[in-house]
């Protein structure tokens, strides 16, 4: 109640006046509808005749009733804020005062808290009416806040203890509740984000697992292909060997003769002689030839640096009996006369030597391996005459040897 002096604690129980209006000409504090209903029900005589004569309309729960409702003659008078005693300087009509009190509760609490702190810091000061007025104002403000928040007509009017620690705790509680609400909102947002990230991580894990599985399948397929390539390479190598043998056989068949006469062309004579002297290639084998289509299989063996008694002095030329496909049908030992010729490419004077096989020699028996031991003429032709200018035994680094096997016998 905004007056010159604060009322006694027992003058108005619960911080509200005993009647809605006792002195219409004086601004009154707001009275909640709960107190108003209680006053109207308990004692109608306390309502002034002017208020009783007016038709009071029912008010909604939690709505404050002021003198503006019943005394129109003072509706426009300016009144001071009930918290003027603690520093609030607002003045205005009852309607604006109602709006001010509804919107300035926080500032009123801070004003009360400042006065309480100052009062608590001065324990020897007057403890009379000022603390009681502050306590009632605080009770009224808390009561109005409770009524507006709940809308309950049965809210009890109470007076909170004037205690700095409780007010500080209340403010801290409000701050913490606001902070908690903000944190809960952030937590909800983060929970949604985490849920989305979890789905993405799960999808990534599934994709990674699928990729690993596919990689394993690809690796196995690659190993299978590599094994297949190795097998194909081996098969190709075998076919190359077979093809090489066929080509060699074909070449031999093209070079071979089947009448007992064989002409052997030797190229790169200088190089071959040098290799023979160095021991790199001691001897040369000629392609095979035959005495007949189904006759003996033979070849020549030449030592360019000599062999045996003709080593380093003569060309040594031998005949080799080879194992043939038709040996079982042929007479043994081999007994045909053999003639060797080193051809003079100027057709002047050929070098000729001949011999008959030694029937007791193993060289002319039926071969038990691929070839028998070579036999022939170790002193076939002197090396000193090989490059003779009078003859063309070697021409264009090429020489020709001829073998004639007598097949008439």
Curated annotation (Swiss-Prot):
UniProt KW keywords: Apoptosis, Coiled coil, Cytoplasm, Isopeptide bond, Phosphoprotein, Ubl conjugation
Pfam families: TRAF-mep_MATH (PF21355), TRAF_BIRC3_bd (PF16673)
Descriptive protein name: TNF receptor-associated factor 1
Notes on the domains: The coiled coil domain mediates homo- and hetero-oligomerization. The MATH/TRAF domain binds to receptor cytoplasmic domains.
Site (Cleavage): residue numbering on this chain: 156-157
Phenotype of the disrupted gene, per the record: No visible phenotype. Mice have normal B-cell proliferation and antibody response, but increased T-cell proliferation in response to CD3 signaling. Their T-cells show enhanced activation of JNK and NF-kappa-B. Mice are highly susceptible to TNF-induced skin necrosis.
Modification type Phosphoserine: residues: 139
Known partners and oligomeric status: Homotrimer. Heterotrimer with TRAF2. Interacts with TNFRSF1A/TNFR1, TNFRSF1B/TNFR2, TNFRSF4, TNFRSF5/CD40, TNFRSF8/CD30, TNFRSF9/CD137, TNFRSF11A/RANK, TNFRSF13C, TNFRSF18/AITR, TNFRSF17/BCMA, TNFRSF19/TROY, TNFRSF19L/RELT, XEDAR, EDAR, Epstein-Barr virus BNFL1/LMP-1, TANK/ITRAF, TRAIP and RIPK2. Interacts with BIRC2 and BIRC3 N-terminus; a single BIRC2 or BIRC3 molecule interacts with a heterotrimer formed by TRAF1 and TRAF2. Interacts with MAP3K14. Interacts with NFATC2IP, TRAFD1 and with HIVEP3. Interacts with GPS2.
Biological source species: Mus musculus (Mouse)
Reported function: Adapter molecule that regulates the activation of NF-kappa-B and JNK. Plays a role in the regulation of cell survival and apoptosis. The heterotrimer formed by TRAF1 and TRAF2 is part of a E3 ubiquitin-protein ligase complex that promotes ubiquitination of target proteins, such as MAP3K14. The TRAF1/TRAF2 complex recruits the antiapoptotic E3 protein-ubiquitin ligases BIRC2 and BIRC3 to TNFRSF1B/TNFR2.
Principal place of residence: cytoplasm
Cellular location(s): Cytoplasm
GO BP annotations listed: apoptotic process; regulation of extrinsic apoptotic signaling pathway; signal transduction
Residue ranges of domain MATH in the record: 259-405
Cross-link (Glycyl lysine isopeptide (Lys-Gly) (interchain with G-Cter in ubiquitin)): 178, 186
Alphabetical list of InterPro entries matching this protein: MATH/TRAF_dom, TNF_rcpt-assoc_TRAF_met, TRAF-like, TRAF1-6_MATH_dom, TRAF1_MATH, TRAF_BIRC3-bd
Transmembrane feature ranges: none
GO cellular component: cytoplasm
Post-translational modification: Polyubiquitinated by BIRC2 and/or BIRC3, leading to its subsequent proteasomal degradation. Ubiquitinated by the SCF(FBXL2) complex, leading to its degradation by the proteasome.
Coiled-coil residue windows: 167-256
Molecular function terms from GO: identical protein binding; thioesterase binding; tumor necrosis factor receptor binding; ubiquitin protein ligase binding; zinc ion binding
């Amino acid at each position: 109640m905004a007056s010159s002096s604060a009322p006694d604690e027992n003058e108005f129980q619960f911080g509200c006046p005993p009647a809605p209006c006792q002195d219409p000409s004086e601004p009154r504090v707001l009275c909640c509808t709960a107190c108003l209903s209680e006053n109207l029900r308990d004692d109608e005589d306390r309502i002034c005749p002017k208020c009783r004569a007016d038709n009071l309309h029912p008010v909604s729960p939690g709505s404050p009733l002021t003198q503006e409702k019943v005394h129109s003659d003072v509706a426009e008078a300016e009144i001071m804020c009930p918290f003027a005693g603690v520093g609030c300087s607002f003045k205005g009509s009852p309607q604006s005062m109602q709006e001010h009190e509804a919107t300035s509760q926080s500032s009123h609490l801070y004003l009360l808290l400042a006065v309480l702190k100052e009062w608590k810091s001065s324990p020897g000061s007057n403890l009379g009416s000022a603390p009681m007025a502050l306590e009632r104002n605080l009770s009224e403000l808390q009561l109005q806040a409770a009524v507006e928040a709940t809308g309950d007509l049965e809210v009890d009017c109470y007076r909170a203890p004037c205690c700095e620690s409780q007010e500080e705790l209340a403010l801290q509680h409000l701050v913490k509740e606001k902070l908690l609400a903000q944190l809960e909102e952030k937590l909800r947002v983060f929970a949604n984000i985490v849920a989305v990230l979890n789905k993405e991580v799960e999808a990534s894990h599934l994709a990674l697992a699928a990729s690993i599985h596919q990689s394993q399948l690809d690796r196995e397929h690659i190993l299978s292909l590599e094994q297949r390539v190795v097998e194909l390479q081996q098969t190709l190598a075998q076919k190359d060997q077979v093809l090489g043998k066929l080509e060699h056989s074909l070449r031999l068949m093209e070079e071979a003769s089947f009448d007992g006469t064989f002409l052997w062309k030797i190229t790169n004579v200088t190089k071959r002689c040098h290799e023979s002297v160095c021991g790199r290639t001691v001897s040369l084998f000629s392609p095979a030839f035959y005495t007949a289509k189904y006759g003996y299989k033979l070849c020549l063996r030449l030592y360019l640096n000599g062999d045996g008694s003709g080593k380093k002095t003569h060309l040594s030329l031998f005949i080799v009996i080879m194992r043939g496909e038709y040996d079982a049908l042929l007479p043994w030992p081999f007994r045909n006369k053999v003639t060797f010729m080193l051809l003079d490419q100027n057709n002047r004077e050929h070098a000729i030597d001949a011999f008959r096989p030694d029937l007791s020699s193993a060289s002319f028996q039926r071969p038990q391996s691929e070839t028998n031991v070579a036999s022939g003429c170790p002193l076939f032709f002197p090396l000193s005459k090989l490059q003779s200018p009078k003859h063309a035994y070697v021409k264009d680094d090429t020489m020709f040897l001829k073998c004639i096997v007598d097949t008439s016998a």
